[in-house]
Curated annotation (Swiss-Prot):
Its cofactor is [2Fe-2S] cluster; FAD; Mo-molybdopterin. Its EC number is 1.-.-.-. This is Nicotinate hydroxylase hnxS. [2Fe-2S] cluster 1 binds at C49, C54. The active site is at E1281. One of its GO terms (molecular function) is FAD binding. The keyword Oxidoreductase applies. Induction: Expression is induced by nicotinate and 6-OH nicotinate, subject to nitrogen metabolite repression mediated by the GATA factor areA, and strictly regulated by the cluster-specific transcription regulator hnxR. Residues 180-192 have a biased composition (Low complexity).
Length: 1350
C-alpha cells in the first residue's frame, strides 16, 4: 500500500443537505450516523440499533430529515405524518419519513409528471420493511403515505377517507394545534425554505431531469370528510436532489486513518488488488452490514478496511450474448440485482421458462432479504464471502450451479459454488482475493428445468433465516417425467450451506410425481440432516421439519408446472393483502377542545427531526461521555478489576463501588436490594460493575471494553423451574381466596364433575422502546447542586436516588425529562441506576457526563416483562361452568426485586379475567434468578394472568366438547358479583354487552361458519377466529401513596399559560391531553398553553407516569388549579363578558393584584385495599374497571407447512367513556394491540446456557413490523395498558386454527400452546407425519442450545 499512498487523498468529499463537505482524515471508525450527529442542528437521525454501516460517502449527496423541511416550512410528507397522527413518541419518525420520501421520490416519473404510486407499492414492495415503530401500530403512518396516491392510479383507498376524520369546527382558530395547516398558496410559492436547499433558490436546476415539469400532488381527492385537511401540495421539482457540483466530481484514491485502522477507497479493481497484495488480510466492505455487526458486538477491529462499492467494474449486471449466463458484479447492490431480475422475467418468460424460473427465485429471495436499506447497500459478493450458514442467497446460488470469479494480483480464479464453503465461515477464496463477479447459468430453453427457493424465519420481513432452501430439478422430456438431475441446497442445517447429495442421488432417475418417490426423498432428507437436540441455534425438530416441509412445497410446485396433481395450499406461501379498516369516531361528549382530535403537539417536531431527546441536547462545555462496564457472567465472584487498560485507551477516569459509601450503593423502587455498582459478586450477565468516561463516546466505549475483570464462576439459576427446585424466591407470601377455605379447596375439586390440571407458560417481552436509556448529569460546583436530564417516567424516584448516591439533598437535585422515545414501563425504575451512575461520575469529575446506551447494552441491563408460569387445577361441571381454581403463579424476577412483587399483585388480581369462579385459592411466588432484573411493562402482570385464564377456558371447552365462546359466555361476571379481592362490579360492568356488540358488528357467527367451510376444503391452510374479553383495573393497586398528583398553572398578562405537572411524555400524548384540559378549563386555544418539560423543581414528589393513571391523576390536578384561577377571574369575566379573551381579563386581574398562579392537587378517592382483608367492607383495590373493558375479535390464516400466519382481520372495541383526544386514544389502542400481538406470537427472549441474553438486538429479537398488522383493522377507542391483552386474540385464533388441523389429523392429545406462539411452536403443534418423521429425541443429559426462562 505504500506505493499507493503518494497517489491517494485523505479528503472525503460529499454533499450534506445540499452543502459541500470536505473532511480531511476523518476518524476511520466513524459511521455516517456518528458524523451527522456530530454536526450542529442535525440530531434528527437516530441511533436505533447500531447494526448497520455506512460504507463510504465520497461523491454522494446525503439528505437527512433536516434537509426535507422544518416545523416552519415542513415538507408535505412531514406535515401529513404529523396531521394524520403518524407519530407518538416520535423517535422512529425521522427514519420512517426518509424511507417514505425515498419511495415517493422514486415513484415520480419525470416524463409523465406523475407519481406512479399505489397502495400495493406502499405496503407490498418492501419500502418500509427496514423501519420499526413500537407505538403507533403502523396504521396512521400508512394512511399518511396513501395521501400521495394519485387519481390516475386509483383514488385514495377508502381506508383513508374513513379515518382522516374530524369536523369543520376543528379548523377554527381556537384549535391552535393545527399549526401545520395554513395558506397552501403562500407556502408553495417561492423558496420552500429547506435547509438542504430549494431549486427555486437556484433557478434552472431540476431535481429529476432537464425537462421542467411543474407537477404537484393534489391535497387529497374531493371528499366531504377530508376537506378540513388543507395539506401542502407536493411539488417534487422544487427539491435539489443532485447538486450541480457532483457533476464535476472526479473520484480519487481515498486513504485515511490512524495507527490502528485505515480506510481505503480504490477507484478500480487494479487499485484494489494492489492494496490486497500488500494487505491480504484487509477487510473488504460494500454495505458493511455484516462487518458492522462484528465491530459493534464482537469488538472486531479491522486494521485496513477497503471500500469496493463504487468500483464500476464490479457494480455492473450483464448478460452473455446468448442470454445463457447472468453476470452479477461482486459489488452490485442487492436492490439492483432484484430490479434486473424483475425487468428480465417478462422478457424471458415467453422464450425460456427455465430462465424465468431462476430469475423469479432470485427476485423472490431478494425481496425478503433483510430490509430495503440493507438491500440498497449490500452486495452478493459479501453474502458469499461471509459464508453464513443461514445465508438467504447462497443456497440458491449453490442449487443453480453458479460460479464465483475472484481475482488476486497474480491470477483470476473461477470457483464453483459447490466448492466454495470449506467450514464454518470459511471459504475457498484465495488470500488477498477480490470477488469481481458471479456467473449464474440459465437452463437451456430445450430443457425442462424448474427452480425455486424458500426461506423460513420468525417474521416474514427483515428477518434472519431459520432455514433456507433452494431446489433445482431437470426433468427428461416425455410422459415419464424422469428426473435427470437434481440439486437440493439448504442453509441452517449445517455449519455451512450444503447440498443434499445423498437425497439428490436417490431422486435422480426416478419418476417425478410418484408418491413413493416423495417418500424416498423425505426419508433420505431425514437421514441426511440428523440434527442433535443440542444443535447450535436450537430448534432441532423444527429445522428438520422444515427441510421436509419445504421440499414438499417444491414437490407440489413442480407438479403444478408439469400438469400433475398438486395441492395449491402446498405451493403458495401466505401473502397478505393491502391493509384496510375503519374507526368508530362518534364522540357525543366532544367539547370545544376536550374530546377533539387534535394532532400530537410535538407531531411536526417529530416528523422534522426537531424534537429533542436526551442525547440530542447540545454538548456542554467540557462534557464527558460514559460507557458501562458490564458483567460477563451470570453469577460469579469478582476476583479483580483492572482499570489501567481503559486509562491507556483514552479514558479520563472511572467510577465503581469505591466511588460512593457502601450504604449508598444500593437502590430499588421498593426494596433496596440492588447494587448501583456490583461489589465482590455479580448476579446477572449485564449487571453494571462500573463506568469509564472519556472525551467522546467512541473512546469511552473502546476503553470500557478494555477493562479486565477476573471472575470465579458460581452456579446460576435461570429458569422458573430451576428456581422452584432450588426454592429460590424473594419474600412475597401473598394470596387471594374466595369461597371454600384453603384446607377444603382440594375437596371442592374432588367433588367437581370434571377436573383438569396443567402448566401454562408465557415468556417475557423486551420493551424495545426506540430510544434507549440515556442521561446527562450536570454538576454545579458553586453550590453542589445538580441538573440531571434523564429518559425516565419517574422524576421523583430519579431525584431520590440521585440525592442518595451524590450525598446532596433532594432540593438541590433537579431531575428533568422533556420527552422519551418510548418507555412502556421500562423507564419507570430501570432508568434510575443509569442516571445515578452518570451522576456519580459527574460529581467525581466535576464535569458534565452524558451516556446513551447501545441497543444491546440496554437490552442486557434494563429488564423485560416478567416471564410467568402457572401450575393450576380447575374444577367444572359438564356445562363448562367453572367452580374451583387452585393455582400457583410464579414470575421470574431476575436478580433483584425491582417491582416484581407489585407485578405479582396485579397478576393475582387479574387471573380470573372476566369470569366468576366461586371457589379460588391463588398463590403468588416471586422467583429469584440470575437474569437481568425484570420490571414494569404495559399491563404490569395482567396480560400474563389473563392469558392463563383464557388458556384454562380453552382447555375446559375442549374437555366438555362445548364451543369456547359459549364457555366464556356462561362464566362471565354479572353486575353485583365480587372479584376475589371483594371489589363489586357495579352497573358500569359492560363486558357482556360489548361481547354481543362485537359479535354482531364483526359478523362473527357468519364468519365462523365460513371458516368451517374454508377449513374443510383446505388441508394445509387453516383459519381460526377468537373473541376475547378483557378487564383492567385502574390505579396503582396496593401502592396507595402513588395515587396522587400535583400541578402548577400560571397565567400571564398576555393570556398565555404555563403548565407544569408531574406527568411525563413518552409518546402517549399526555402533554397534548393535559394542554387540552387546561385550554378547555381556561377557555383559551391550545396554542396559548405551554408545557416545557417535567422537572422535580417545578413539580415535587411526582408519582411515576404509569398504571394508565397519567391522564386521570394529572388531568384532575390541572383542573383543580384551573378551577382556582377561574374562581379568581370570575368577577372579571362578568365585567368584560364571556367572550373577552384571557389576556384582557388577566391584565385587569393583575392590576388588581389577583394571584394568577395556582397549585392543583388530586388524590384518587375510595381506594385502599388491604391484602388479607376478606371482609365485604374492604376498600376497593382499583378505582374502576369500567371504561377500560374491551373485546377483541381476530381472524387468522395459518400455513400448517411452516407455521407462518397472517392476521386477516381484527375488530377491537373498548369502553373508555369520555375521551380527551380520540385520535391519540386510537393510536394507543392500535399500538397496544400490535404490541400485544408481538408478545403473544413473535417476541421470544432466549438465553444461552451460560446465562447471557441471546436475543439482544433487532437481528435476533423481532417485534411486529408494517407487514404484521391485521389486514383489516377496525377499532373503537382505547388507551394505555388495557388494550394490550387484546393482542392475545391472535394467539387464540391461531389455537382455533390448530384445533381444526389436529382434529382433521386425528390428534387426540390436549393442545398446549405456550406463549409466544412462534412459527416453531405453531408448526410442531400440527402433529402431522412430517413432524413425526423429523422428531429429535433428547438424550439423557442433553440440553437445548437456548434457554427460555419462563
Amino acid at each position: 500500500m505504500d506505493a499507493l499512498l503518494p497517489r491517494s487523498s485523505p479528503q472525503l468529499k460529499f454533499y450534506l443537505n445540499g452543502t459541500p463537505i470536505s473532511l480531511t482524515s476523518p476518524h476511520p471508525r466513524w459511521t455516517l450516523l456518528d458524523f451527522i450527529r456530530s454536526q450542529d442542528g442535525l440530531k434528527g437521525t437516530k441511533l436505533g440499533c447500531g447494526e448497520g454501516g455506512c460504507g463510504a460517502l465520497s461523491g454522494k449527496h446525503v439528505i437527512t430529515i433536516e434537509g426535507l423541511g422544518t416545523v416552519d416550512h415542513p415538507h408535505p410528507l412531514q406535515e401529513r405524518i404529523a396531521q394524520l397522527h403518524g407519530s407518538q413518541c416520535g423517535f422512529c419518525t425521522p427514519g420512517i419519513v426518509m424511507s417514505l420520501y425515498a419511495m415517493i421520490r422514486n415513484a415520480y416519473d419525470p416524463v409523465t409528471g406523475k407519481f406512479q404510486l399505489s397502495a400495493d407499492d406502499i405496503e407490498s414492495k418492501g419500502h418500509l420493511d427496514g423501519n420499526l415503530c413500537r407505538c403507533t401500530g403502523y396504521k396512521p403512518i400508512l394512511n399518511a403515505a396513501r395521501t400521495f396516491i394519485e387519481d390516475d392510479l386509483g383514488s385514495v383507498p377508502s381506508i383513508v377517507e374513513s379515518e382522516l376524520v374530524g369536523t369543520e369546527e376543528e379548523t377554527e382558530s381556537d384549535m391552535g394545534a393545527h399549526s401545520g395547516s395554513g395558506d397552501t398558496g403562500s407556502r408553495s410559492s417561492g423558496s420552500c425554505g429547506r435547509p438542504g436547499g430549494c431549486c427555486k433558490d437556484s433557478p434552472g436546476i431540476s431535481s429529476c431531469s432537464s425537462r421542467e415539469t411543474d407537477m404537484t400532488t393534489p391535497s387529497l381527492p374531493d371528499s366531504p370528510v377530508l376537506k378540513q385537511y388543507d395539506f401542502i401540495p407536493y411539488t417534487p421539482t422544487t427539491e435539489l436532489i443532485y447538486p450541480p457540483g457532483l457533476a464535476k466530481f472526479v473520484p480519487e484514491l481515498l486513504c485515511y486513518g490512524d495507527a490502528e485502522q485505515a480506510w481505503v477507497k480504490p477507484r478500480s479493481v487494479q487499485e484494489a488488488l494492489e492494496i490486497l497484495s500488500q494487505c491480504p488480510s484487509a477487510t473488504l466492505v460494500t454495505g458493511a452490514s455484516e462487518v458492522q455487526v462484528d465491530v459493534r458486538f464482537k469488538d472486531f477491529r479491522p486494521s485496513v478496511s477497503v471500500f469496493v462499492g463504487d468500483i464500476t467494474e464490479m457494480t455492473g449486471i450483464s448478460w452473455s450474448e446468448d442470454m445463457k449466463t447472468l453476470y452479477i458484479g461482486g459489488s452490485a447492490s442487492l436492490s439492483d440485482i432484484e430490479a434486473e431480475c424483475l425487468r428480465c422475467i417478462p422478457l424471458l418468460k415467453a422464450v425460456n421458462l427455465g430462465s424465468e424460473s431462476v430469475l423469479s427465485a432470485i427476485a423472490r429471495t431478494l425481496r425478503y432479504f433483510a430490509g430495503r436499506q440493507i438491500r440498497n447497500a449490500a452486495c452478493l459478493a459479501g453474502n458469499i464471502a461471509t459464508a453464513s450458514p443461514i445465508s438467504d442467497m447462497n443456497p440458491l446460488l449453490l442449487a443453480v450451479g453458479a460460479t464465483v470469479h475472484a481475482r488476486t494480483s497474480a491470477e483470476e480464479t473461477t470457483i464453483p459454488m459447490s466448492e466454495m464453503f470449506k467450514g464454518y465461515r470459511k471459504t475457498a477464496l484465495p488470500s488477498g482475493s477480490l470477488i469481481t463477479k458471479i456467473a449464474v447459468p440459465m437452463p437451456s430453453k430445450d430443457q425442462i428445468e424448474i427452480v425455486n427457493a424458500y426461506k423460513q424465519a420468525k417474521r416474514k420481513d427483515d428477518d434472519i433465516a431459520i432455514v433456507t432452501a433452494a431446489f433445482r430439478v431437470r426433468i427428461a422430456p416425455g410422459p415419464d417425467y424422469t428426473v435427470q438431475e437434481a440439486s437440493l441446497a439448504f442453509g441452517g442445517m449445517a455449519p455451512t450451506t450444503v447440498l443434499a447429495h445423498k437425497t439428490a442421488s436417490a431422486l435422480e432417475g426416478k419418476r417425478w410425481g410418484d408418491e413413493a418417490v416423495l417418500d424416498i426423498v423425505l426419508t433420505s432428507l431425514g437421514e441426511e440432516f440428523n440434527l442433535p437436540y443440542s444443535v447450535p441455534g436450537g430448534m432441532a425438530t423444527y429445522r428438520r421439519t422444515l427441510t421436509l416441509s419445504l421440499f414438499v412445497r417444491f414437490w407440489n410446485y413442480v407438479n403444478q408446472k408439469l400438469g400433475l396433481e398438486y395441492d395449491s395450499d402446498l405451493i403458495e406461501e401466505i401473502h397478505r393483502g393491502i391493509s384496510t379498516g375503519t374507526r368508530d369516531d362518534d364522540n357525543p361528549h366532544a367539547q370545544r377542545v376536550v374530546g377533539q382530535q387534535i394532532p400530537h403537539l410535538s407531531g411536526l417536531k417529530h416528523a422534522t427531526g426537531e424534537a429533542e431527546y436526551v442525547d440530542d441536547m447540545p454538548p456542554l462545555h467540557r462534557e464527558l461521555h460514559g460507557a458501562l462496564v458490564l458483567s460477563e457472567r451470570a453469577h460469579a465472584k469478582i476476583l479483580s478489576v483492572n482499570w489501567t487498560p481503559a486509562l491507556e485507551r483514552g479514558a479520563v477516569g472511572y467510577v465503581d463501588h469505591t466511588s460512593l459509601p457502601e450504604e449508598k450503593n444500593h437502590w430499588g423502587p421498593v426494596v433496596h436490594d440492588e447494587p448501583v455498582f456490583a461489589k465482590g459478586e455479580v448476579h446477572a450477565h449485564g449487571q453494571p460493575i462500573g463506568l469509564v468516561y472519556a472525551d467522546d463516546a467512541m473512546t469511552a466505549q473502546i476503553a470500557a471494553k478494555a477493562v479486565i475483570v477476573t471472575y470465579e464462576d458460581l452456579p446460576a439459576i435461570l429458569t422458573i423451574d430451576e428456581a422452584i427446585e432450588a426454592r429460590s424466591f424473594f419474600n412475597y407470601g401473598k394470596e387471594l381466596r374466595r369461597g371454600a377455605p384453603p384446607e377444603e379447596i382440594r375437596k371442592e375439586l374432588d367433588d367437581c364433575e370434571y377436573t383438569l390440571s396443567g402448566t401454562t407458560k408465557i415468556g417475557g417481552q423486551e420493551h424495545f422502546y426506540l430510544e434507549t436509556n440515556a442521561a446527562i448529569a450536570v454538576p454545579h460546583t458553586e453550590d453542589g447542586s445538580m441538573d440531571v436530564w434523564s429518559s425516565t417516567q419517574n422524576t421523583m424516584e430519579t431525584q431520590d436516588f440521585l440525592s442518595q448516591v451524590t450525598n446532596v439533598p433532594r432540593h438541590k437535585i433537579n431531575a428533568r425529562v422533556r420527552r422519551m422515545g418510548g418507555a412502556f414501563g421500562g423507564k419507570e425504575s430501570r432508568s434510575v441506576p443509569i442516571a445515578c451512575i452518570v451522576a456519580v461520575a459527574a460529581k467525581k469529575a466535576r464535569r458534565p457526563v452524558r451516556i446513551m446506551l447501545n441497543r444491546d447494552e440496554d437490552m442486557m441491563t434494563s429488564g423485560q416483562r416478567h416471564p410467568v408460569q402457572c401450575r393450576w387445577k380447575v374444577g367444572f361441571n359438564r356445562e363448562g361452568k367453572l367452580l374451583v381454581l387452585d393455582a400457583d403463579t410464579y414470575n421470574n424476577a431476575g436478580y433483584s426485586v425491582d417491582m416484581s412483587a407489585a407485578v405479582m399483585d396485579r397478576c393475582l388480581t387479574h387471573i380470573e379475567n372476566c369470569y366468576y369462579i366461586p371457589n379460588v385459592w391463588l398463590r403468588g411466588w416471586v422467583c429469584k434468578t440470575n437474569t437481568h432484573s425484570n420490571t414494569a411493562f404495559r399491563g404490569f402482570g395482567a396480560p400474563q394472568a389473563m392469558y392463563i385464564t383464557e388458556s384454562i377456558i380453552s382447555a375446559v371447552a375442549e374437555k366438555v366438547g362445548i364451543d369456547v365462546d359459549e364457555i366464556r359466555r356462561r362464566n362471565l361476571y354479572q353486575v353485583g358479583q365480587r372479584t376475589p379481592f371483594n371489589q363489586v362490579l357495579d352497573e358500569d360492568w359492560h363486558v357482556p354487552l360489548l361481547l354481543e356488540q362485537v359479535r354482531e358488528e364483526a359478523d362473527y357467527d357468519a364468519r365462523k361458519k365460513e371458516i368451517e367451510r374454508f377449513n374443510s376444503e383446505h388441508r394445509w391452510r387453516k383459519r381460526g377466529i377468537a373473541l376475547i374479553p378483557t378487564k383492567f383495573g385502574i390505579s396503582f393497586a396496593t401502592a396507595l401513596h402513588l395515587n396522587q398528583a400535583s400541578a402548577a398553572v400560571r397565567v400571564y398578562t398576555d393570556g398565555s399559560v404555563l403548565l407544569n405537572h408531574g406527568g411525563t411524555e413518552m409518546g402517549q400524548g399526555l402533554y397534548t391531553k393535559m394542554v387540552q384540559v387546561a385550554a378547555q378549563e381556561l377557555r383559551v386555544p391550545v396554542d396559548q398553553v405551554y408545557t416545557q418539560d417535567t422537572s422535580s423543581y417545578q413539580t415535587a414528589n411526582a408519582s411515576p407516569t404509569a398504571a394508565s393513571s397519567g391522564s386521570d391523576l394529572n388531568g384532575m390536578a390541572i383542573k383543580h388549579a384551573c378551577d382556582q384561577i377561574n374562581e379568581r377571574l370570575r368577577p372579571y369575566r362578568e365585567k368584560y363578558g364571556e367572550d373577552a379573551d384571557l389576556g384582557t381579563i388577566a391584565k385587569a386581574a393583575y392590576r388588581d393584584r389577583v394571584n394568577l398562579s395556582a397549585a392543583g392537587y388530586y388524590k384518587m378517592p375510595t381506594i385502599g385495599y388491604e391484602w388479607g382483608n376478606y371482609s365485604e367492607n374492604v376498600k376497593p383495590m382499583y378505582f374502576y374497571f369500567t371504561q377500560r373493558q374491551g373485546v377483541a375479535c381476530t381472524e387468522v390464516e395459518l400455513d400448517l407447512l411452516t407455521g407462518t400466519h397472517t392476521v386477516l382481520r381484527a375488530d377491537l372495541k373498548m369502553d373508555i367513556g369520555r375521551s380527551i383526544n380520540p385520535a391519540i386514544d386510537y393510536g394507543q389502542i392500535e399500538g397496544a394491540f400490535v404490541q400485544g400481538q408481538g408478545l403473544f406470537t413473535m417476541e421470544e427472549s432466549l438465553w444461552t446456557r451460560s446465562g447471557q441474553l441471546a436475543t439482544r438486538g433487532p437481528g435476533t429479537y423481532k417485534i411486529p413490523g408494517f407487514a404484521d398488522i391485521p389486514q383489516v383493522f377496525n377499532s373503537s377507542k382505547g388507551i394505555g395498558e388495557p388494550p394490550l391483552f387484546m393482542g392475545s386474540s391472535v394467539l387464540f385464533a391461531l389455537r382455533d386454527a390448530l384445533s381444526h388441523a389436529r382434529r382433521e389429523r386425528g390428534v387426540s392429545e390436549p393442545l398446549v400452546l405456550d406463549s409466544p406462539a412462534t412459527v416453531e411452536r405453531l408448526r410442531l403443534a400440527v402433529g402431522d407425519d412430517l413432524v413425526h418423521r423429523a422428531q429429535v429425541q433428547r438424550k439423557d443429559g442433553e440440553q437445548g442450545f437456548f434457554v427460555a426462562v419462563a
